[in-house]
């Protein structure tokens, strides 16, 4: 059996894993889906390796998976078989089996999807966004609009995609009116490297309903350091839910 590839090694090779939210609990399970696109773009070297790393919400490395993918090979990995009751982050990369050099300063990120299955019958998915970062990075302001009538069911998932041991995230959250007025502002709790934090809107802003008033919508803004593109979510009492990148 091949030895586990360290995530830092993948970054050094020029193939930094891309990061997504991981949720495996008594309501939702996460499936990672990928296609061996190297067999399309590198026809002379069509074989690839899929590497998947799992982290809990505190950034602790809790699982690893590797699979060889031949021409047109596909991966559909139910991560709950590796970590049945862990939520945090998942990172995945594809590496060509043939050692294909990446030009200095360049990087190749992996396109893949995560599908989230609710035991109540809902399915939602997300494509990957940012790759992991070896060093701390500033976060531009991320903003998303929500429907006020679902404020009690809404929330945000924040992810720290930095690998550095001293790369904890810091930042602020703003509750915004649709006209751009700031209704409330809070400091965010620090998130450990490769960790994640899922928080309901009313936990983050307890007075949100009063502040939003009769407006049909509101926005939340997040900025700071080491915060990857957040996810907005709605999760209803009947188990239905949705998840979207900012």
Question: Which residues fall in each region the model found?
Answer:
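Gly/Pro-rich, tryptophan- and cysteine-flecked surface segments typical
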Residues: 1-246
């Amino acid at each position: 059996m091949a030895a586990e590839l360290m995530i830092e090694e993948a970054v050094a090779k020029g193939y930094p894993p891309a990061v997504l939210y991981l949720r495996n609990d008594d309501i939702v399970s996460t499936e990672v889906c990928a296609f061996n696109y190297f067999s399309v773009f590198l026809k002379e070297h069509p074989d690839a390796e899929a590497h998947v790393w799992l982290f809990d919400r505190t950034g602790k490395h809790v699982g690893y998976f590797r699979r060889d993918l031949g021409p047109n090979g596909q991966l559909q990995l139910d991560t709950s078989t590796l970590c049945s009751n862990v939520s945090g982050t998942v990172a995945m990369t594809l590496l060509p089996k043939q050692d294909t050099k990446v030009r200095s300063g360049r990087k190749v990120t992996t396109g893949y999807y995560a599908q989230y299955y609710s035991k109540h019958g809902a399915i939602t998915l997300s494509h990957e966004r940012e790759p992991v970062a070896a060093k701390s990075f500033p976060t531009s302001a991320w903003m998303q609009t929500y429907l006020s009538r679902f404020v009690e069911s809404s929330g945000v998932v924040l992810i720290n995609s930095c690998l550095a041991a001293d790369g904890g995230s810091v930042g602020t959250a703003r509750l915004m009116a649709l006209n751009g007025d700031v209704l409330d502002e809070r400091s965010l709790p620090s998130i450990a490297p490769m960790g994640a934090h899922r928080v309901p809107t009313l936990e983050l802003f307890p007075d949100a309903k009063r502040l939003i008033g009769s407006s049909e919508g509101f926005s939340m803004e997040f900025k700071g350091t080491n915060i990857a593109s957040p996810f907005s979510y709605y999760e209803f009492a009947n188990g239905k839910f949705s998840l979207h990148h900012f």
